[in-house]
């Protein structure tokens, strides 16, 4: 109605049959363009109808901001042209399961929240040179994602940013990165529903970041420590002394037994 001047968070959450918005003439706060809800001046896209059947959409040139949850659940969209957008809200494309590729425009500096989470058909993402932050759960469970550039200037990868991205087998990370969140990349949930499994085939190319180096070191040893905690044997060689560590688990407690297997002087073979 013309009298509506405020729409609260989650106002259209779960409206899975909604195909179009209409705004009464004379409304000073909102307008509808081709069935999509905008602020009155079209500078912000507020909500794309979840049940709209089109496979492609171009954001109007006047629009600069995509609001939080604005495309959530738009399951038929395969292509989206973001045009002049400079800000993208949290969970913006959450569960856009048909989306195949996306080019984020110049001017966008951060992707906070689960912006592209569960975009299960998303294969390629192009990020601009202005990008600085990829937030928590940004590309969570984008199982088809195989190609993404991380530009120099990005400083942060949030917690589980690329979690469960099993098709992403090679990733170059710039020297500008100073912070990487827990399990940001290299982990997935397997077919049996077991979380935090390591993606062994992932090749991380570090372009000089100390944070990446530390994360990669931790990630590479993750499977060994998980195996040890489950109960196993570690063989450690240091200073010519071979030590066997037996790890036992009983009633959620861990007990270790250390045995010296051999002592060999450096440079001398048995």
Descriptions of predicted regions:
Residues 227-246:
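Selective detector of the "anchor" transmembrane alpha-helix that sits immediately C-terminal
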Residues 214-228:
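Short, aromatic-rich amphipathic segments at membrane interfaces
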Residues 100, 112, 149, 160, ...:
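Intrinsically disordered, low-complexity polyampholyte segments enriched for Lys and acidic residues
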Residues 252-270:
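Cytoplasmic C-terminal tails of single-pass
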């Amino acid at each position: 109605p013309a009298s509506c001047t405020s729409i609260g968070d989650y106002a259209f959450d779960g409206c899975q049959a909604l195909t179009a918005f209409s705004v009464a003439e004379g409304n000073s706060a909102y307008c509808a363009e081709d069935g999509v809800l905008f602020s009155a001046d079209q500078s912000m896209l507020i909500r794309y109808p979840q049940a709209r059947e089109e496979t492609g959409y171009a954001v109007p040139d006047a629009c600069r901001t995509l609001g939080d949850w604005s495309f959530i659940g738009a399951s038929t969209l395969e292509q989206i042209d973001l045009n002049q957008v400079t800000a993208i809200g949290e969970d913006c494309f959450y569960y856009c399961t048909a989306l195949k590729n996306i080019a984020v425009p110049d001017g966008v500096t951060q992707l906070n929240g689960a912006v592209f989470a569960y975009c299960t058909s998303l294969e390629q993402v192009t990020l601009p040179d202005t990008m600085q932050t990829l937030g928590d759960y940004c590309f969570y469970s984008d199982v088809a994602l195989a190609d993404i550039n991380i530009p120099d200037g990005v400083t942060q990868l949030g917690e589980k940013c690329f979690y469960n991205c099993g098709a992403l087998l090679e990733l170059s990370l710039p020297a500008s990165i100073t912070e990487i969140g827990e399990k940001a990349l290299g982990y997935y949930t397997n077919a049996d529903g077991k979380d935090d499994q390591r993606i062994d085939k992932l090749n991380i190319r570090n372009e000089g970041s100390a944070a990446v180096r530390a994360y990669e070191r931790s990630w590479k040893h993750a499977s060994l420590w998980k195996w040890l905690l489950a109960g196993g044997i570690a063989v450690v060689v240091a200073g010519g002394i071979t030590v066997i560590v037996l790890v036992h688990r009983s009633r959620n407690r861990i007990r270790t037994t250390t045995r010296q297997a051999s002592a060999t002087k450096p440079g001398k073979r048995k």
